[in-house]
Amino acid sequence: MNVLKCLAIISVLGIFFIPRYSESAISCSVVLQDLQPCVSYLTSGSGNPPETCCDGVKSLAAATTTSADKKAACQCIKSVANSVTVKPELAQALASNCGASLPVDASPTVDCTTVG
């Protein structure tokens, strides 16, 4: 086998076996993009959240795997929740009503220092 083929094989194997390390936590824009379909539900809705909202909640749950991601998402959610009036009961039940697990409720009173 020539040197180029060996390097190509090593490169391909490296893609699959070298662990990925995130340099930074999830961005607030990603959090907002995921939860944007939930805003009208959280502010004036009732019953179960719409499917598009739950899709965003599940996407966010999948994206917040590290402690840094969870804290960043918490800070973002808290800052947005402070700027709009959400129904507390809907915010608390959002993740469970969508069959997902988020690190925090969509609430302005959440304590982000305990998240992680």
Curated annotation (Swiss-Prot):
One Pfam assignment: Tryp_alpha_amyl
Listed GO MF terms: lipid binding
Intrachain S-S bonds: C28-C76, C38-C53, C54-C98, C74-C112
One GO process term, biological-process aspect: lipid transport
Signal peptide interval: 1-24
Cited PANTHER family: NON-SPECIFIC LIPID-TRANSFER PROTEIN 2-RELATED (PTHR33076)
Family, per entry: Belongs to the plant LTP family.
Name this polypeptide is given: Non-specific lipid-transfer protein 8
Gene: LTP8
